[in-house]
């Protein structure tokens, strides 16, 4: 019986087991059926990284990766900016940029975040003639006072190493272009991270040529500004860039349209913009060596250019007939030509870069609903229309994302019941903005910038633009290191964390290692561990370059992020050191001393301290000067200046007899004789530099003053003097003669007491001031001069003031009098000048000016009377030649006299002046 019971239980258990198996199978079949009915659909989206600032990450429908290749072409290549503007307006994306020469400059700036509109404005406002000028020197206003005086005399500078003449590699180091590119990159919204050009807003490549190996070099890292500068370094004209063992120059030598480089960036659709210059057709156009070299290169590059263009999916060739690669006067037309050419093909490009969604689900006949746009009134109707008309699920999702109002989109389809739900995620709304990491004033300004977006819907692109505007705002305030460290929307609030940044370190790279490090560091306005401002960089570049011991000064930032996403920034300072043994040559011809030559030879970086040791001499038919000196413009890290010199100076002067008209008296001006002045001695001075505008100096001079009889002489003088001079000088003029801006002030007091060894004890005070201003864009220049001198009655003849002439460091300017025509101990003179360019220019810049002077000079203070004031009027034609200013002038002096109670004008014969070259 027990076994029967066991068999009954076993049968019952088997039935239950089979029943359980059937239930499980039914559940599995049901789930499989449901799974077949519900399908999640995601679009094919782009896989490359979006490097721009975003409010939140967002998807973009899959398309071809677009690479833009910008050719060289000099000024012609500015048409690239017009192409970029058209692409922005048409919504054509750029995923990679490759550039050569000017194309590298345009492409590099665009990749770093400058918009086409900003580049358009830059192209119009930059002084291209100055940036590409072959003659290059330190700006006068950035030189120390004594440097200004020395360089004002020279027309030619030769470099030596020992006694070996150094032949420069090029006509220009292109410092101005280097500087503006450095500053533009430092002010850009996106800067390379880890010196990698892939981390810019758009990955970028600059194509250059290594002059050593003769190979093409594609720059993908390093200094962005230096890469642009290297790619545009035209051989012979601009110095190549030294990197490691390479000499990098214009990429157009080997690849003026480097389409194949786009492949290395993964570009699937390559757009080439051709702006290369055609061959010269007129033999007369090949008039200088570099044009001949350019023609040879152009001939050699014709076939490679065509081969590269065949690799492009689209070629844009603006109509640039009649435009020169070196003429920057028709920039607006160049921009418009590029814009027009790009607009013509923009729609076709937009179609060709599109890719169809793969394995799309046909949703014709499906019941469609949309989730996520319930509160999106501004664009809900448009989205509903897109969905209603859709035949493919992925295509509909892609079209919704193309509106740019959504960050994500997917669909769920029930293939059994023919229903589909589209899930759209709009850009997040925010109703408040919280900014941290900046000052309260800056935070308030940023809040104001985002006021229009509060509570509103916006596109992803608009969100990026507003965030970039915040960084641009910080750049305008000078913050070179500022960035948006984190952006997120949380609890209906837009949180923006800003890192203004501090400089971690400064790395100095010298080409030859001649200058001592403290000399370089004292000129830097930046400090490690402190915030970095753009004006500090600009000031540092100016100061270093103005020292005169560097051919080129370049600065850039390198950023590295730590594990916590905080950034460490290093400022790299690259210095191309100049050979410091220099010979300067100057020439001058005038109506007083005829031909004169100036020679100066000195070491301008003595012992690596930027101090100067050397000598100069000036030789003319009637004058001679020689001087040896040691000069430290700055002692150690201070602005204390020091110099010591030994000198010899001799000048021959005419003695005049001048008679003004009187009743029965004919006016005349006669030379009645000639005498000479000789000075020799030693001098030592200590003072303080007033930055680079001037200095205040105490100077002690022990010297011999001699009056040398020639055909006539005043009372013979030959005395030893020990003179203390306190001098204050400010010089902000942009030129020593014919300045258009700036001022010059010189005040000194001489004291020559007997207890210091002077054979004659005297004192004198002198003041002069010149003010220059311009109106109507520099087409009218005004100049005011004031001079006054007061000396005691014991002042010897050789130390008295002089009056007359149109320009000299020895005689106060007075149009209508000859140079050094009158001498005395009391001087008061004022002068006005108006200058304007001639409508017809005589080969070089030509100006016409009118002059008026009033004042006089007297022997004794008791003689000073207002009625004795002389007046002078004159006209002048001046030409700015390569060897200095050429001046032709005529003037007449007069005074008001009285005869038999009648006031009349007394005149003297007119004076004619001529000079060519700089003043010595």
Annotated model-derived regions:
Residues 438-448, 460-461, 469, 483, ...:
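Gram-negative/organellar outer-membrane beta-barrel architecture
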Residues 32-36:
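Sec/Tat signal peptide C-region and signal peptidase I cleavage site
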Residues 37-100, 108-432, 498:
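Patatin-like phospholipase
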Residues 1-14:
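N-terminal secretory signal peptides that target proteins for export/translocation
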Residues 775-854, 859:
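Extracytoplasmic gating/loop element in the C-terminal half of outer-membrane beta-barrel translocons
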Residues 20-29:
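Bacterial N-terminal signal peptides
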Residues 335, 343-589, 600, 614-634, ...:
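Periplasmic polypeptide-binding modules associated with outer-membrane biogenesis and secretion
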Residues 852-873, 896:
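Outer-membrane beta-barrel transmembrane domain signature
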């Amino acid at each position: 019986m027990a076994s029967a019971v066991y068999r009954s239980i076993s049968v019952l258990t088997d039935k239950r087991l089979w029943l359980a198996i059937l239930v499980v199978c039914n559940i599995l079949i049901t789930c499989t059926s449901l799974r077949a009915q519900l399908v999640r659909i995601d679009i094919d989206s782009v896989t490359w990284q979006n490097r721009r600032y975003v409010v939140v990450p967002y998807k973009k429908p899959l398309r071809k990766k677009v690479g833009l290749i910008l050719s060289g072409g000099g000024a012609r290549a500015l048409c690239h900016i017009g192409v970029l503007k058209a692409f922005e307006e048409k919504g054509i994306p750029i995923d990679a940029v490759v550039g050569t020469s000017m194309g590298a400059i345009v492409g590099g700036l665009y990749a770093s975040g400058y918009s086409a509109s900003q580049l358009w404005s830059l192209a119009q406002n930059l002084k291209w003639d100055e940036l590409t000028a072959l003659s290059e020197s330190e700006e006068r206003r950035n030189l120390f006072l004594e440097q200004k005086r020395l360089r004002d005399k020279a027309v030619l500078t030769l470099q030596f190493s020992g006694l070996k003449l150094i032949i420069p590699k090029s006509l220009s180091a292109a410092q101005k272009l280097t500087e503006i590119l450095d500053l533009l990159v430092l002010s850009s919204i996106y800067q390379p991270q880890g010196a990698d050009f892939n981390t810019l807003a758009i990955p970028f490549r600059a194509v250059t040529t290594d002059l050593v190996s003769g190979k093409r070099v594609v720059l993908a890292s390093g200094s962005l500004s230096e890469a642009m500068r290297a790619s545009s370094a035209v051989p012979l004209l601009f110095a190549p860039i030294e990197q490691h063992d390479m000499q990098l120059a214009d990429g157009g030598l080997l690849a003026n349209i480097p389409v194949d480089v786009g492949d290395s960036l993964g570009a699937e659709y390559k757009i080439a913009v051709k702006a290369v210059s055609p061959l010269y057709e007129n033999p007369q156009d090949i008039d200088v060596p570099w044009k001949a070299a350019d023609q040879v290169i152009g001939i050699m590059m014709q076939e490679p250019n065509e081969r590269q263009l065949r690799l492009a999916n689209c070629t844009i060739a603006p109509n640039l007939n009649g435009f020169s690669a070196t003429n920057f006067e028709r920039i607006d037309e160049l921009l418009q030509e590029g814009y027009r050419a790009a607009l013509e093909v923009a729609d076709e490009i937009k179609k060709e870069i599109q890719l169809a969604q793969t394995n799309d689900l046909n949703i014709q006949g499906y019941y469609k609903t949309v989730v996520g746009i319930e509160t999106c009134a501004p664009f809900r109707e448009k989205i509903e229309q897109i969905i209603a008309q859709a035949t493919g699920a992925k295509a509909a999702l892609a079209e919704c994302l193309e509106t740019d109002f959504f960050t994500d989109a997917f669909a769920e389809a029930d293939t059994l019941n023919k229903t589909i739900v589209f899930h759209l995620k709009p850009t997040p709304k925010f109703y408040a903005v919280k900014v941290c990491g900046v000052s309260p004033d800056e935070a308030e300004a940023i809040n104001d910038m985002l006021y229009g977006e509060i509570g509103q819907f916006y596109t992803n692109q608009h969100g990026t633009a507003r965030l970039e505007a915040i960084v641009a705002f910080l750049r305008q305030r000078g913050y070179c290191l500022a960035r948006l460290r984190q952006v997120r929307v949380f609890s209906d609030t837009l949180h923006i964390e800003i890192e203004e940044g501090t400089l971690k370190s400064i790395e100095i790279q010298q080409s030859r290692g001649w200058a001592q490090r403290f000399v370089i560091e004292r000129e830097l306005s930046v400090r490690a561990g402190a915030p970095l401002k753009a004006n500090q960089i600009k000031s540092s570049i100016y100061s270093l370059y103005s020292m005169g011991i560097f051919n080129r000064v370049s600065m850039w930032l390198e950023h590295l992020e730590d594990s916590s996403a905080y950034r460490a920034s290093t400022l790299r300072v690259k210095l191309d050191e100049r050979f410091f043994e220099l010979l300067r040559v100057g020439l001058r011809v005038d109506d007083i001393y005829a031909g004169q030559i100036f020679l100066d030879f000195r070491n301008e970086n003595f012992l690596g301290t930027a101090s100067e040791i050397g000598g100069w001499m000036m030789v003319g038919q009637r004058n001679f000067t020689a001087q040896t000196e040691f000069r430290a413009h700055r002692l150690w890290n201070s602005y204390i200046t020091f110099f010591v010199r030994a000198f010899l100076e001799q000048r021959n002067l005419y003695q005049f007899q001048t008679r003004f008209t009187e009743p029965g008296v004919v006016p005349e001006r006669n030379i009645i004789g000639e005498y000479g002045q000789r000075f020799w001695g030693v001098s030592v001075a200590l003072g303080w530099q007033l930055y680079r505008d001037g200095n205040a100096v105490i100077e002690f001079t022990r010297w011999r003053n001699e009056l040398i009889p020639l055909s006539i002489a005043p009372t013979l003088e030959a005395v030893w003097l020990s003179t203390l001079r306190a001098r204050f000088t400010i010089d902000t003029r942009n030129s020593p003669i014919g300045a258009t801006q700036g001022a010059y002030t010189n005040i000194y007091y001489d004291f020559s007491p007997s207890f210091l060894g002077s054979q004659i004890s005297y004192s004198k005070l002198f003041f002069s001031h010149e003010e220059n201003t311009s109106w109507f864009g520099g087409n009218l220049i005004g100049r005011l001069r004031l001079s006054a001198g007061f000396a005691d009655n014991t002042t010897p003849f050789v130390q008295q003031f002089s009056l007359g002439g149109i320009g000299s460091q020895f005689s106060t300017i007075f149009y209508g009098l000859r140079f050094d025509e009158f001498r005395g101990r009391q001087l008061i003179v004022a002068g006005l000048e108006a200058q304007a360019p001639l409508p017809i220019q005589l080969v070089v810049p030509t100006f016409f000016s009118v002059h008026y002077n009033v004042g006089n000079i007297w022997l004794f203070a008791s003689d000073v009377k207002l009625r004795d004031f002389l007046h002078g009027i004159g006209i002048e034609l001046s030409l700015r030649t390569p060897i200095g200013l050429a001046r032709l002038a005529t003037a007449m002096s007069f005074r008001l006299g009285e005869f038999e109670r009648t006031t009349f004008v007394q005149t003297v014969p007119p004076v004619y002046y001529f000079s060519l070259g700089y003043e010595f």
